[in-house]
Amino acid sequence: AGASAGCGNPVGIADAKTGETVLDLGSGGGIDCFLAAKEVGPTGSVIGIDMTPRMLELASTNAEKLETTNVVFKLGHIEQIPQEDDSVDLVISNCVIALSEQKERVFSEIFRILKPGGRFVISDIVTDKPLPDDVRKSAAEWVSCVGGAAVMSDYLAMVEETGFDKIEILEDRKSTGGTEEWRSSMINLTLRAFKPAE
């Protein structure tokens, strides 16, 4: 499908059910959306959100090629998701929240759009200690999902403070690549949490 960079496989472990509504934050070329679309079937639906028109165009082209009819792509930002309150069963995201400077806002938006009892499965880059200032301020490191990586304990605290419960780390493996000392603190995190049922 092209133009999809990730740090995990949220769809593979999200356990999307037939008939569910799934929303993908930062859908890129749409690969995670198309995988989710197969799981939810024709009675379900998948919404891909991306902030770049070029990616939306690519994803729509890919949807046509794959003859996928239960996926829609929307232009939007993850800090202000263009979706109704309490309307989604499952939110997925693959290495996107690290790109936001407003992670608390992103988690609040996820909480807002999830139905009571709904869940998210997110793969993201975090660290086990604060990054050096020069890394956090480097545009190149932000683009590669590194510069915006939060310390894992802070990331988990944001999720909990938003109101999610049953927070579960599904995977946390050290990132590989690079020779700089700080790279050894990078972690690929996959996390699941639930919006409490009413």
Where is each model-derived feature located?
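Hydrophobic beta-strand segment of the Class I
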Residues: 22, 91-92
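Core SAM-dependent methyltransferase catalytic element
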Residues: 165, 172, 176-198
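Class I SAM-dependent methyltransferase SAM/SAH-binding core
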Residues: 18-80
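Class I SAM-dependent transferase core
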Residues: 1-23, 62, 135, 182
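Short, glycine-/aromatic-enriched active-site segment of Class I SAM-dependent methyltransferases
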Residues: 127-146
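Short alpha-helix
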Residues: 148-163
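A short glycine-rich, Lys/Arg-flanked "PGG" loop and its adjoining helix->strand segment in the class I
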Residues: 104-119
